[in-house]
Amino acid sequence: MEKLILRRVDRQNEEMILNFGPQHPSTHGVINFLVETDGEVLKRATPDVGYLHRSIEKIGEMVGYPGFMPYTDRVDYVAAMFANEGYAIAVERLLKIEVPQRAQWLRAISCELCRIASHLVSVGTMVMDIGAFTPMLHGIRERETINDLLEALCGARLTYNYHRIGGVAFDLPEGWRDKVLHFLDHFDKFLAEFDRLISFNEIYVKRLANVAVIPGPMAINYGLVGPNLRGSGVDWDVRRDLPYGAYPNFKFDVPVGKGFFGTSGDSFDRYYVRCLEMAESSKIVRQALDSLPEGEITAKVPRNIKPEAGEAIGRVESARGELAYYVISDGTNKAYRVRARTGSFTAMCIIEDISRGLMVADLVALISSLDVVAPEIDR
């Protein structure tokens, strides 16, 4: 990205240079954009990140392997389960540990519920950013029910620390399965209602269709992942194409953008792919609960973890796409190197190219459609 040089502008025209953030409600975290406009048209929008940098990768090299697990929750506090699982898989591969089947199923259940909760925040805040406040409250209402379920499962509502090296921390509490199924019965009806009221609303469609189009090849070149990549028509999902855990045992579809109301890869496609993914997550949770095997929930893991010297990658399909941990062991009880590859950073990189020529109001829609989360950007 080129550096935006601040300069004087002619007062006789409508050019402006302003800061969009870092505390703007539409930036979804402490993110700043240096925005150059000509009237209501964007000439340039340069992301300015780093406001939430906490050296989390370096922390992973300073504490023991189990000690870093609670920090992974902070990589993406909106969908923390996935960051737990990605790191756990990487360390398990270093240790050559086989995770019990029941633990793999519990991981899938918790992650898919977390995916639904994250997507509810994404689609709800997207509608709110465009100007409709009430639908966001509908999404938060459903998310609160999921938070209650996850709190009953692991004792926390946002930063779960549920996945552990070798398995999971807790088994299902009594009656939890029935509560989840009852919620899913209601949630499937909620999705249909949300589509009717919001997704297919004429005003909403006009605000998103054909806006901020990202063609498939461009999405690949920028390294987009998850719903942002699939929204551009690229059929790629780590759960299916690089299967891990219990996912090979479940049947589910991978929604991709098809130009539902406009052009493939526009803001509406990115939005609606997330809506369709919530329905698929509901299917996966039902299958996992129906086929949940008996057995242990954690493998035998040494108290003092010292993997042999080597390297491993743990990748999962998070709510924001492929989340990968690259961990290097030097044979001690602390990692030599921990690297997290997240989807939000690459999504930020594409904004400058895509935003040129948009209206200022459409920049808000573009940021929302990419579903960036600040701690995933600043690591």
From Swiss-Prot:
GO cellular component: plasma membrane
Keyword Cytoplasm appears in the UniProt entry: no
Keywords, in A-Z order: Cell inner membrane, Cell membrane, Membrane, NAD, Quinone, Translocase, Transport, Ubiquinone
Record's catalysed reaction(s): a quinone + NADH + 5 H(+)(in) = a quinol + NAD(+) + 4 H(+)(out)
Subcellular location(s) of the protein: Cell inner membrane
GO molecular function annotations of the record: NAD binding; NADH:ubiquinone reductase (non-electrogenic) activity; quinone binding
Family in the record: Belongs to the complex I 49 kDa subunit family.
Subunit structure and binding partners: NDH-1 is composed of 14 different subunits. Subunits NuoB, C, D, E, F, and G constitute the peripheral sector of the complex.
The protein's name in its UniProt record: NADH-quinone oxidoreductase subunit D 1
Lineage summary: Bacteria, Pseudomonadati, Myxococcota, Myxococcia, Myxococcales
Gene (name only): nuoD1
